[in-house]
Amino acid sequence: MDHDPKERLLLPPRAAAAAAANGPHRRAAPAAGGGGGGVAIDVHGLKRRGGGRRSWVRVDAATGASEAVEVAKPALMRRLDLPARDLRLLDPLFVYPSAILGRERAVVCNLERIRCIITADEALILRDPDVAGGGAETEEAVRRYVAELQRRLVDRADDLPFEFIALEVALEAACSFLDAQAVELEADAYPLLDELTTKISTLNLERVRRLKSKLVALTRRVQKVRDEIEQLMDDDGDMAEMYLTEKKRRMEASLLEEQAFQGMGNSGFGSSFSAPVSPVSSPPASRRLEKELSFARSRHDSFKSADSSQYSIEELEMLLEAYFVVIDYTLSKLTSLKEYIDDTEDFINIQLDNVRNQLIQFELLLTTATFVVAIFGVVSGVFGMNFEVDLFNVPHAFEWTLVITGVCGLVIFCCFIWYFKKRRFFPL
């Protein structure tokens, strides 16, 4: 008995109630005879969290209606032919960088706070509160994404496929979020850096260090989104793979055409019994006619497929190029901010080097003055020895000794200063 694939994704009320009663946060009962103070780990709850049901918001492509559903990972894998590694990108228990993956029947998007699976008929947006970025912020981002997607589905006037509209809204949400963070970081950074150039303090240096850490993390995220868009733009096969509506239409047309040819074959086979034909000339003629019709049909399909693929690739490429310009502008702002921080660091290092040079010059002057003073110490030490010196009996000998020693010390000090300036140890 066949079931609607949408019904397989929705949980029955009893299953949802059982999942809520036996959720991953339920504490396991202690074993009999064991101590009552220990806390047991609910291994089955962890297994259910890793591979169980997730809360999603489903947006229908035809009507734009949204509803909250709980979808099991195995059901998604079976219905959309997605490998487990693709769904792992959307798992809130793991931290993965931004990624856009085009598959046979779906497009998997992990763009900042928007994690969704887009098909030709619907979009499933993950609204789990454990998603990185905070439960309330993620819930608000999902709500805005759904509202914007519904608005564009209602107001759309062009023939843009649903998957491109959903992808465009996701790219716009990610680019706007990253650009807002970049603007906020710029508003905090430039005044702080200007203040640091005039007043170097430990507090300002610590604030700049934290700001630079935020800048590096944000630049890495923006660079990843930019690389994903650029990688898609450089690969025509990946862009053609993301044209889900066209692939679905071709598949339906191929099935109808196959059924029509099977019906024609059956009717032709039935009529061959009622009318006598020549046993020699008829089968080769019918086979030749069949080959010509098949060849003409295949050529027509190939030409139509090539034209449609080229159109879809150009359409998607223009869409991606628009947001590539936006994210590249955000990256250029962050790069300019990083260069400004580097220039400020260089300026501070120059200032510190200048202060260090001044301290070295002062130390050199102090050392030279100490050497000159040491000359007085030598003279006083010589005259302080306990032996007879005839100079002690000469009138005014003490005054002349002080004058001559001072003049000699001053001359030696001036010679040192002249030498330092000649060797450019001191500024002229």
UniProtKB/Swiss-Prot annotation:
Keywords: Ion transport, Magnesium, Membrane, Transmembrane, Transmembrane helix, Transport. InterPro entries: CorA_TM1_TM2, MRS2-like. It is a multi-pass membrane protein. The chain crosses the membrane at residues 364-384, 400-420. A motif (Required for magnesium transport activity) lies at residues 384-386. CDD domains: Mrs2_Mfm1p-like. GO terms for molecular function: magnesium ion transmembrane transporter activity. GO terms for cellular component: membrane. It comes from the Eukaryota. GO terms for biological process: magnesium ion transport. It is found in: Membrane. SUPFAM superfamilies: Magnesium transport protein CorA, transmembrane region. Its main location: membrane. Belongs to the CorA metal ion transporter (MIT) (TC 1.A.35.5) family. Magnesium transporter that may mediate the influx of magnesium. This is Magnesium transporter MRS2-C. The gene is MRS2-C.
